[in-house]
Amino acid sequence: MNIVLFEQEEVVHGCAVLSFRDSRFCHIKRVLKLSAGACFKAGIINGVKGSARISLATEKYLVAVFEKLEYEDCALFPLHLVIGFPRPIQLRRILRDVSSLGISSIHLVGTELGERSYLDSGLAHMEKMHTYLIRGLEQAGGTKLPLITVSESVRTFCSQHTHILGDSTHQKLILDTKNTLTDLGSAALRGDVLWIAIGSERGWTESERLLFSAMGFRAVDMGRRTLRTETAACAACAVVLANAHAWKRKIPRPGKRSSPISRKNP
């Protein structure tokens, strides 16, 4: 945990109270070993970040006073993932890890070859998924949560996002092992926004491939090795962000002109 995050409603008049049952209390007291008067990195989810000072600390609770707070000076990367709904243990890892990478959104879709019971699992509820997204932010030291949606099928997802996916300035790629013309690392990336679709354990069916193709998705691969969904998701994000030189520059906050998430041609 590299930043302690709070929901906006937890902060009243610049102060927040944590009880001994709260994992954040345990981290501050037992891991950081801080006491009254000490400061720690803190932030408000989807809001400001900076530091907080412990004004009072007992064995039962502590009071933190926020100070030196400012808005993050960069936005999330304009990268969006569409993922075939994976097993719960995989989903936890994906939500945590891609959230820490700073992507804009995660869209979970039921697939024809996927296990339908995954969609009915407790982890499919937004509150549960929210928890793992926050863990990724705590690791990365950020405050901005990616958007997350759940769709029953690829067809449903496409119909719900036609107005977005139909935008010609959005580049769309689907990771696949069939009908690919190039690999992800060699794909010429262009445009301000990039979508990447990644299948669940058993991949995509032909009808799902046709749906994505109709929405303008191009098939690419990541070599001959068969990867787990969580591995493919993190690797794909890393390849795209590295090729876009995303880690060498700041993404402007909303309202400012954004640079394309594209690879610079020699």
Swiss-Prot record:
Q: Gene3D superfamilies annotated for this entry? A: 3.40.1280.10
Q: Which GO terms describe its cellular component?
A: cytoplasm
The UniProt entry lists the main location of this chain as: cytoplasm
Q: Where in the cell is it found?
A: Cytoplasm
The catalytic activity of this protein is classed by the Enzyme Commission as 2.1.1.193
Reactions accelerated catalytically:
uridine(1498) in 16S rRNA + S-adenosyl-L-methionine = N(3)-methyluridine(1498) in 16S rRNA + S-adenosyl-L-homocysteine + H(+)
Superkingdom, natural source = Bacteria
Q: Keywords for this entry? A: Cytoplasm, Methyltransferase, rRNA processing, S-adenosyl-L-methionine, Transferase
GO BP: any one term = rRNA base methylation
UniProt key word rRNA processing: yes
One GO molecular function term of this record is:
rRNA (uridine-N3-)-methyltransferase activity
Could you tell me which InterPro entries the record lists for this protein? Alpha/beta_knot_MTases, RsmE, RsmE_MTase_dom, RsmE_PUA-like, tRNA_m1G_MTases_N
Asked if the keyword rRNA processing belongs to this entry, the reply reads yes
| Described purpose of this protein according to its UniProt entry | Specifically methylates the N3 position of the uracil ring of uridine 1498 (m3U1498) in 16S rRNA. Acts on the fully assembled 30S ribosomal subunit.
Q: What family does the database annotate?
A: Belongs to the RNA methyltransferase RsmE family.
The protein, known as: Ribosomal RNA small subunit methyltransferase E
Query: Which species is this record about?
Result: Treponema pallidum (strain Nichols)
